[in-house]
Amino acid sequence: MDTLIRIKRCALAGRLRLTEKARDELELDDLDITDIRESLVNAVAIYKTIRSRNPRTGRREHLHIIQSPNLAGIAIYTKGKLVIVSGVETYYLLVSSKRCS
């Protein structure tokens, strides 16, 4: 299944998790989880997928970067990964900002 569709399904089902850093960035940018959900659902493409290494486990992972507006038209940048939590696919957000470049 297409990765963007999987991410959108997680957003629609409320299966989004945020790191503490992402929560802080949301607060600084005066955004909330609804803005992120709207941005992910509105996305037409994944801007970039990068390979990374998890600093805690050392395992390789794919991080998906999405740049898309929410329903108010605010351009939002997100970086996250799809993970399985208790047998359910969840989108784990590492970074979130309304500053798209």
Task: Identify the residue ranges that each predicted region occupies.
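Ribonuclease/tRNase effector modules and their secretory precursors
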Residues: 1-101
